[in-house]
Amino acid sequence: MGKLLTMAMPKGRIFEEAAGLLRQAGYRLPEEFEDSRKLIIDVPEENLRFILAKPMDVTTYVEHGVADVGIAGKDVMLEEERDVYEVLDLNISKCHLAVAGLPNTDWSGVAPRIATKYPNVASSYFREQGEQVEIIKLNGSIELAPLIGLADRIVDIVSTGQTLKENGLVETEHICDITSRFIVNPVSYRMKDDVIDEMASRLSLVVEGETAK
């Protein structure tokens, strides 16, 4: 019996892309894997256990060791700054963090208000720009904030830009590109380095193959 590897996976769009990547890497996941409503899924034939978590919680699970490895967006890693190893850029779930707001708006006022799910990232970015701002943390529907006068600008994830467009907002600043990463708990890596290295290697081959296309 090999070592059981527990992997934290984000629910939603990243989960489906990550599951596809694991299958390409040769891991035999059950057909109903993506459709399961379970939060813990065991795949005994691969010595794998999956914990399905909210995207913002994956790094927490890995840092605390309840998951040995995980797949997390770079946005979450920048925001949470957890003590985990970032082993591999999986090059999936591509998007970027951006500043956006209503067009033709004067933003020269004192301490503009910024609404975001990423208060740490936003604070750091505007500090680097030498701009003093007031951060308002929201948990969803960030695009609503400028429309109702809650904030002057927003910092949020942009994929296609369609959501911004539909709400009459325009992107004004590109903060950084985002992809999903394969992350590892430092203690788990010492105890299970063989199986973790194997998974990283198999995933890396798939990523390199996709990038070369």
Swiss-Prot record:
Name recorded for this polypeptide: ATP phosphoribosyltransferase
Keywords: Amino-acid biosynthesis, ATP-binding, Cytoplasm, Glycosyltransferase, Histidine biosynthesis, Nucleotide-binding, Transferase
Family stated for the protein in its record: Belongs to the ATP phosphoribosyltransferase family. Short subfamily.
Gene Ontology biological process terms, A to Z: L-histidine biosynthetic process
Compartments where found: Cytoplasm
Major subcellular site: cytoplasm
Substrates-to-products reaction catalysed: 1-(5-phospho-beta-D-ribosyl)-ATP + diphosphate = 5-phospho-alpha-D-ribose 1-diphosphate + ATP
Ubl conjugation in keyword set: no
InterPro entries tied to this protein: ATP_PRibTrfase_cat (IPR013820), ATP_PRibTrfase_CS (IPR018198), ATP_PRibTrfase_HisG (IPR001348), ATP_PRibTrfase_HisG_short (IPR024893)
Transferase in keyword set: yes
Record-annotated disulphide pairs: none
Pfam families for the chain: HisG
Enzyme class, spelled out: transferase
Gene: hisG
One GO MF term: ATP binding
Organism of this sequence: Bacillus subtilis (strain 168)
Function comment: Catalyzes the condensation of ATP and 5-phosphoribose 1-diphosphate to form N'-(5'-phosphoribosyl)-ATP (PR-ATP). Has a crucial role in the pathway because the rate of histidine biosynthesis seems to be controlled primarily by regulation of HisG enzymatic activity.
Cited SUPFAM superfamilies: Periplasmic binding protein-like II
Assembly: Heteromultimer composed of HisG and HisZ subunits.
